[in-house]
């Protein structure tokens, strides 16, 4: 089994859903900025890339229709480079990277682009596809299958006795750490400009 390594990383800044600077940016376009920057930093010849695996939790709108393939084309990769989409909700991007690593470790591929993209502003709005979006059999037999992330968090919190004030304290600590890291320039090499 081969060892998979990450040659380079890149990402866009995080925007504010519905009111930020990316609120009308299509998902393939958003992903392309990070993909192009990562490929450039890696020094890999785009012709050598064997797959683009992208994760997205809400695969509709411009995030639908195989976001991996759309991101590859938007990034200017050769048309022979295929793409693949992964939906594992919040872990979609991480799972895409893991799948790419497994392809390399199992000697199925040599060079893979993996990552995630989400444009909440363009998929969770008044135009979201909610028409018959839940299976009746599942609703009748396993009604919690469509539980939202917020409901899941509440359930986990109650089950394990994690109080709200402790969660808030942890979240605030995380925000402080992020702000400090940004101030100290720790993210400067990985965040790419989107114009």
List the predicted regions and their residue ranges.
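Conserved "HGTGT" condensation-loop signature of ketosynthase/thiolase-family condensing enzymes
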Residues: 1-81, 117-195
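Claisen-condensing/thiolase-fold acyl-transfer catalytic domains that form or cleave C-C bonds
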Residues: 59, 66, 70-73, 77, ...
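Hydrophobic alpha-helical hairpins/lids featuring a short glycine-rich hinge
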Residues: 95-127
């Amino acid at each position: 089994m081969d060892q998979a390594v990450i040659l380079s990383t890149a990402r866009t800044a995080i925007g504010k859903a519905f009111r930020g600077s990316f609120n009308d940016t299509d998902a393939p376009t958003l992903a392309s900025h990070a993909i192009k920057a990562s490929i450039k930093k890696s020094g890999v010849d785009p012709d050598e890339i064997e797959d683009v695996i992208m994760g997205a939790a809400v695969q509709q709108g411009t995030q639908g229709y195989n976001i991996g393939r759309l991101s590859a084309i938007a990034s200017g990769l050769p048309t022979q480079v295929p793409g693949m989409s992964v939906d594992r909700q919040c872990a979609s991007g991480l799972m895409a990277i893991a799948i790419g690593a497994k392809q390399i470790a199992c000697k199925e591929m040599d060079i893979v682009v993996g990552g995630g993209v989400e444009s909440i502003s363009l998929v969770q709005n008044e135009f979201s596809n909610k028409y018959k979006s839940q299976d009746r059999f599942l609703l009748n037999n396993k009604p919690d299958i469509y539980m939202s992330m917020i409901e899941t968090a509440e359930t986990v919190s109650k089950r394990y006795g994690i109080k709200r004030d402790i969660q808030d304290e942890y979240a605030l600590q995380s925000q402080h750490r992020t702000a400090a890291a940004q101030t100290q320039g720790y993210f400067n090499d990985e965040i790419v400009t989107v114009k």
